[in-house]
Amino acid sequence: MHVLRTPDSRFENLEDYPFVAHYLDVTARDTRPLRMHYLDEGPIDGPPIVLLHGEPTWSYLYRTMITPLTDAGNRVLAPDLIGFGRSDKPSRIEDYSYQRHVDWVVSWFEHLNLSDVTLFVQDWGSLIGLRIAAEQPDRVGRLVVANGFLPTAQRRTPPAFYAWRAFARYSPVLPAGRIVSVGTVRRVSSKVRAGYDAPFPDKTYQAGARAFPQLVPTSPADPAIPANRKAWEALGRWEKPFLAIFGARDPILGHADSPLIKHIPGAAGQPHARINASHFIQEDRGPELAERILSWQQALL
């Protein structure tokens, strides 16, 4: 496995990202250790909130949520998935698998001895985070899903997804900043777009971003389906608090909250919402999301 590491100079003077970098080595069951970057802000003994990003972003996506959450006394942790942000980037699409991504994040949880966290997930963060919540329930005490789902290949996949999958794999360029700007309601400035482009100096660094759409299970024959279906069954017994906050203007996942709310017992009576946002809901409504999490957290005390 050939691994790339984005130069630190790419992350200097980013717009609205004053956070300290932390690193640790993570492993999957069949790979050597890789360096994962993460943010760890707020009091070390505060209630832990973990924020998981998705495709093709990194912890930069959470920059407007972190300070309000830490100002309220929470410890906020936001890792960059392997292949993204300041984390190591295996250089081949074939180096990535759904199971490896789950393993890498579980390894990160284990190294930091995290348990009873409030877990906020979006996009691929939900595909990973929902598996972890189901398979290691002691690690997650409260669960928030925003524009996410757990694929079990039991529903029709929208044609638009297959177009996105082909684009991600074969397009000569994969402009992360432009992708984010298309998936938002509000205008994304050139400086912010540059923040999303920062992890990828050139296309050789983008194998992880190109791999993600290929790894979404759409067929019952996909190797991830047995574990995902088992996790879905476990979520059907999840009685801890579950909250769905979705972007009403997300063209693909804007209504994916309904199956989650119906299936997960812990969703009953919670203040679920569809807000004026598109797919990158954190970019559209980051401070509002933070406020909703804090209000929910307070109500659960």
Swiss-Prot record:
The keyword Lipid metabolism does not apply. Residues 47-284 form the AB hydrolase-1 domain. Pfam families: Abhydrolase_1. It comes from the Bacteria. Optimum temperature is 50 degrees Celsius. The active site is at residues 123, 250, 279. Gene3D superfamilies: alpha/beta hydrolase. Keywords: Hydrolase. Its EC number is 3.8.1.5. Optimum pH is 8. One of its GO terms (molecular function) is epoxide hydrolase activity. It catalyses: 1-haloalkane + H2O = a halide anion + a primary alcohol + H(+). Catalyzes hydrolytic cleavage of carbon-halogen bonds in halogenated aliphatic compounds, leading to the formation of the corresponding primary alcohols, halide ions and protons. Has a broad substrate specificity, which includes mono- and di-chlorinated and brominated linear alkanes (up to at least C4). Shows good activity with the priority pollutant 1,2-dichloroethane. Belongs to the haloalkane dehalogenase family. Type 1 subfamily. Monomer. HAMAP family: Haloalk_dehal_type1 (MF_01230). This is Haloalkane dehalogenase. It comes from Mycobacterium avium.
